[in-house]
């Protein structure tokens, strides 16, 4: 009996230590991904950057995160996780994440020609992106294993909150270490690569802690007589026909389209948020940075509350409409509110943050209600696949808008025009999101047997 009590499975402190080892790589991943979000203003004037990138280059670089995910990386690597286990495959992709980040850091530090540095950084971002996504899946699966039967929702909520705190930290810290200069002054490579160096250092710490977790997890399985591989019954094994079954479900397609349009309205907006808020509302860089950092802080605060609300009262499709409407209204305010009035910036970002917390709380729990359990893995993979298509395309397009519109350094009229044209993209996406949310609402009304709008039992 004493041996049973001393196993890692039954040691709550060991479980929380394992969680501590798991959250740092995710914090670092989110930090590195958003390290340039509050510095996007720099890319408006490539002639003042030793790096030489313009906004189109920045948008292209940002899209690299999703490239390998689009081309089957998520689905294939998810199958590898099931077959070979979290410790082996997770370690490979944590390593890929760190290597990709190191390649990006090298590319923006080595003094290459802009086209060369962009190409190398794009390859690095592709590797970093796929590594981060699969590392995230590995972390989620590991938390589910270690916290089975005890505080699993709390552990997963803490992991997500700390990861999103990585985004907020990057947004707040980057302008502090790359200080704003007078118009026309040059930003050297040794200045613009500082966020990447810090992000890479945190990723390295995260990789070390992942290795600690792997050792703990191996001992966990040895004590419990289990394996980190997934044993799948013959009838539940993946078949390509499952993809068609999922894609032929109209309500699944609605959720997938809502997912890609809604998330692009928020996540891809963050990549250019400072460059949009500065000219439209006349705020300084510190205020614009603070506004952008409000978005992840809102999700940390409100997502668990809205999740509990959906569980308690149901009405998931209605909450999706409300959240989508808030995000669309936010972009309408940013675009059409009187310019130079900072109060509208605070209102719009607050609405964006609340909407960003509300829709996922209602959307993700709806998927198991419309897809059979044995196809859930395929369904979630397909949602992420479709989402990454938008995540790849939107920053490229928005980056080209800024590069096309801004041809003179410090031309305020051009900066306003670019910000407005970029916002039109996000408004269009928001209109599609709310239209699809309405379609899902009426589909739920016509199909009450799906219980989409019923509270959790």
Which residues are covered by each model-predicted region?
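Cytoplasmic helix-loop-helix junction between adjacent transmembrane helices
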Residues: 124-162
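Extracytoplasmic gate region of multi-pass secondary transporters
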Residues: 36-41, 249-299, 303, 394-395
């Amino acid at each position: 009996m004493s041996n049973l009590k001393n196993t890692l499975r039954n040691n709550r402190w060991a479980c929380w230590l394992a969680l501590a080892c798991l959250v740092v790589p995710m914090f670092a991943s989110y930090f590195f991904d958003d390290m340039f979000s509050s510095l996007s203003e720099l890319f408006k004037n490539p002639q003042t950057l030793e790096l030489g990138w313009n906004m189109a280059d920045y948008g292209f670089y940002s899209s690299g995160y999703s490239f390998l995910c689009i081309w089957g990386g998520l689905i294939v690597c998810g199958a590898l996780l099931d077959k070979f286990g979290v410790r082996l495959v997770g370690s490979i992709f944590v390593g890929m994440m760190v290597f990709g980040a190191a390649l990006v850091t090298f590319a923006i530090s080595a003094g290459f020609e802009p086209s060369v540095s962009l190409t190398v950084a794009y390859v690095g971002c592709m590797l970093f992106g796929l590594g981060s996504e699969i590392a995230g899946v590995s972390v989620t699966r590991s938390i589910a294993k270690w916290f089975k039967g005890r505080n699993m929702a709390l552990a997963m909520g803490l992991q997500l909150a700390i990861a999103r705190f990585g985004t907020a930290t990057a947004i707040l810290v980057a302008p502090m270490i790359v200080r704003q200069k007078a118009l026309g002054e040059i930003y050297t490579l040794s200045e613009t690569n500082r966020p990447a160096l810090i992000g890479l250092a945190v990723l390295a710490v995260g990789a070390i802690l992942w290795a600690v977790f792997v050792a703990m997890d191996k001992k966990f399985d040895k004590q419990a007589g289990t394996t980190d591989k997934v044993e799948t019954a013959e009838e539940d094994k993946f078949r390509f026909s499952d993809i068609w079954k999922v894609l032929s479900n109209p309500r699944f397609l609605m959720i997938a389209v809502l997912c890609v349009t809604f998330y692009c309205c928020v996540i891809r907006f963050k990549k250019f948020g400072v460059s949009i808020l500065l000219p439209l509302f006349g705020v300084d860089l510190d205020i614009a940075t603070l506004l952008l950092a409000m978005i992840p802080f809102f999700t940390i605060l409100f997502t668990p509350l809205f999740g509990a609300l959906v569980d308690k009262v149901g009405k998931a499709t209605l909450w999706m409409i409300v959240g989508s409407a808030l995000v669309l209204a936010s972009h309408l305010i940013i675009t059409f509110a009187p310019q130079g009035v900072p109060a509208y910036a605070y209102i719009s970002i607050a609405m964006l943050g609340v909407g960003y917390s509300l829709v996922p709380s209602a959307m993700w729990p709806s998927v198991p209600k419309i897809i059979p359990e044995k196809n859930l893995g395929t369904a979630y993979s397909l949602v992420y696949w479709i989402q990454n298509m938008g995540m790849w395309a939107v920053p490229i397009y928005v980056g080209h808008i800024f590069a096309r519109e801004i041809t003179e350094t410090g031309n305020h009229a051009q900066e306003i025009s670019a910000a407005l044209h970029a916002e039109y993209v996000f408004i269009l996406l928001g209109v599609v999101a709310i239209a699809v949310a309405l379609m899902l609402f009426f589909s739920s009304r016509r199909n009450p047997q799906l219980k989409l709008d019923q509270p959790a039992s």
